[in-house]
Curated annotation (Swiss-Prot):
Disulfide bridge partners, by residue number: none
Native organism: Homo sapiens
Main location: nucleus
Gene: ANHX
Record-linked CDD domains: homeodomain (cd00086)
Protein name (record): Anomalous homeobox protein
Pfam families: Homeobox_KN (PF05920), SIX1_SD (PF16878)
Length: 379
């Protein structure tokens, strides 16, 4: 020990230690491997030396230093030391020490006194040893391909739970022990039982929603697109919302915005034309207009969004000339109906508009255009 410490101090400033110094360090570590009390001062001197990287390339020195660090509860430092050493040809003892250190780390984390074989296997898979400790790679624990095929053929064709005599025969044929054969078939049965359990969640998901694959994207109508109904014009969304909310009824009319106009029985059916209009103002307005220009003076009555056109009458100062008894009352479903005679008596001969609010210019010019087109088509 003293001679080693003396040589170590003499070659402290050298780039590489002499071969006899490395050999002496390895022999001392191998001799004191069972006596940690004497090994600890030697390990401390090696780790504090500037030549430690060269000394740790010796398998006995690396093994002694890692054991001392592990004994001092410095597992992380021991793992870093094993990762940094470059042992020629590797060392199975260093690989086993690497695994033992990680076993203790897992036991400390789980709070258990020992690990099961499965836990040790998972620990080795998660923490493989560095390539410097096993240059040829980890030794495969799997059976050869021919052995696995023979055992699998027996499980598929004969029995998955062979008897003791069958296991002994298989052990002789495959050069395995009866315990290895027993464990292989036990693992095979465990894997077969686990397959249906993995398939159940997918089958349940498919059974709960069988049309998930066939379901296409829902075709939704945009909220801004108008709806077209039979006998009605396109109605934008804002007008539908106003109809659902129900704006206050005008005292001049009680007709709904899309209800047909109640006509007197004296009106000839062939001379009466009902035209839907696009409502841009208040839907509850009532207008009586006398067309001009190419419409030949046709009379139009608009209630809500409907336009009723009638050929011109003889009396120029009134829109309608029938007497009150000849006019049919409005349907009883609408309280307080207003007859066309009452409206005509209070209106001038040219144009009168009676509504809750002033109709917009777009609606007025739209009505005039429809009036001209209807006059030209009917004329």
């Amino acid at each position: 020990m003293q001679s080693f410490l003396t040589l170590l101090k003499e070659h402290e400033d050298t780039c590489a230690p002499p071969a006899e110094l490395v050999t002496l360090a390895g022999r001392l570590c191998r001799d004191f491997q069972d006596d940690l009390a004497q090994l600890q001062p030697l390990v401390t001197a090696i780790l504090d030396s500037q030549l430690r990287l060269h000394l740790l390339d010796n398998a006995d020195v690396a093994l002694a230093c890692a054991r001392v660090l592990d004994q001092q509860e410095q597992q992380q430092a021991a793992c870093r030391l094993l990762e940094g050493c470059q042992v020629p040809g590797g060392s199975q003892e260093l690989v086993q020490l690497w695994n033992d250190i990680h076993y203790r780390l897992v036991m400390r984390r789980l709070g258990v006194a020992a690990l099961t074989p499965v836990q040790k296997f998972r620990c080795r898979k998660r923490n493989p040893p560095p390539p410097s400790l096993c240059p040829e790679g980890l030794k495969s624990r799997n059976f050869p391909r021919e052995v696995r095929e023979k055992l699998h053929n027996f499980a598929v064709g004969v029995n998955t739970n062979p008897s003791k005599a069958e296991r002994e025969n298989l052990a002789l044929e495959t050069s395995l022990t009866p315990e290895q054969v027993y464990n292989w078939f036990a693992n095979y049965r465990r894997r077969q039982r686990a397959l249906p359990q993995h398939m159940k969640p997918a089958q349940q998901a498919t059974a709960e929603d069988p049309g998930a694959r066939e379901r296409g994207p829902d075709l939704l109508q945009p909220s801004g697109n108008p709806r077209v109904d039979s006998g009605f014009v396109d109605r934008p969304q804002w007008s539908e919302e106003r109809e659902e909310k129900g704006p206050p009824q005008s005292p001049q009319t009680t007709q709904g915005p899309w209800e047909p106009l109640a006509l007197a029985p004296d009106f000839p059916a062939d001379e009466t034309v009902s035209k839907p209009l696009d409502v841009s103002g208040h839907p509850q307005s009532v207008q009586l207009e006398e067309g001009l220009g190419t419409s030949s003076g046709r009379t139009e009555l608009r209630v809500g969004s409907f336009l009723v056109t009638q050929p011109p009458l003889q009396a120029p100062e009134f829109i309608l000339t029938q007497s009150p008894p000849e006019l049919a009352p409005a349907p009883s479903a609408f309280p307080g109906p207003v007859s066309a005679m009452e409206l005509s008596q209070a209106l001038p001969s040219s144009q009168v508009q009676c509504s809750d609010s002033q109709a917009s210019g777009d609606a007025f010019w739209g009505a005039r255009m429809l009036l001209e087109f209807s006059g030209s088509s009917l004329g």
